[in-house]
């Protein structure tokens, strides 16, 4: 069933850009991994939109982040407002329309698909099981061989041969 649902994404390869973050909690500490992930996804989505708008100046687009309802709704909306007004560590996110829109995933097939992408990413990074994840790799935002839509937050002292780190030549610190 999961494989069939993810195949729907793969069938629309040219029209879909995925964004995901895998966080090693120990490497992120003392930062909140949810907030760190949210900032990275916002930044990467904003950069994708900026790149797209530069390539297509007559078809400028803004992005809306739609998320599953959770206990993190209020804090993440506050962070999104802060990023638009004062910026994040990456600057202001000028290509996002407003704060994230939170919906019950039971009411949205797109959010259910996003949940499956998150699950596949979690299985890959937590259990080294790429059964679902590997078919998604070509769907992550990518330019010039670098996967921008997938970020792995980890200790730079550890070797890593995941798609995200290899595409940036970040197997080891200094490498």
Where do the protein language model's features map onto the residues?
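Phosphate-ester processing/binding pockets and catalytic centers
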Residues: 1-175
């Amino acid at each position: 069933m999961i494989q069939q649902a993810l195949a729907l994404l793969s069938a629309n390869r040219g029209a879909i850009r995925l964004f995901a973050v895998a966080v090693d909690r120990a490497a992120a500490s003392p930062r909140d991994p949810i907030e760190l992930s949210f900032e990275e996804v916002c930044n990467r989505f904003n950069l994708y939109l900026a790149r797209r708008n530069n390539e297509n100046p007559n078809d400028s687009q803004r992005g809306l982040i739609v998320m599953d309802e959770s206990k993190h709704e209020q804090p993440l909306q506050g962070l999104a407002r802060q990023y638009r007004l004062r910026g994040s560590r990456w600057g202001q996110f000028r290509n996002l329309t407003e704060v994230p829109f939170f919906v019950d995933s039971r009411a949205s097939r797109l959010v259910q698909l996003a949940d499956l992408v998150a699950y596949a990413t979690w299985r890959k990074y937590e259990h080294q099981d790429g059964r679902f994840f590997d078919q998604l790799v070509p769907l992550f935002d990518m330019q010039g061989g670098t996967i921008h839509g997938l970020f792995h937050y980890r200790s730079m002292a550890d070797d890593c041969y995941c798609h995200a780190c290899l595409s940036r030549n970040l197997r080891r610190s200094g490498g």
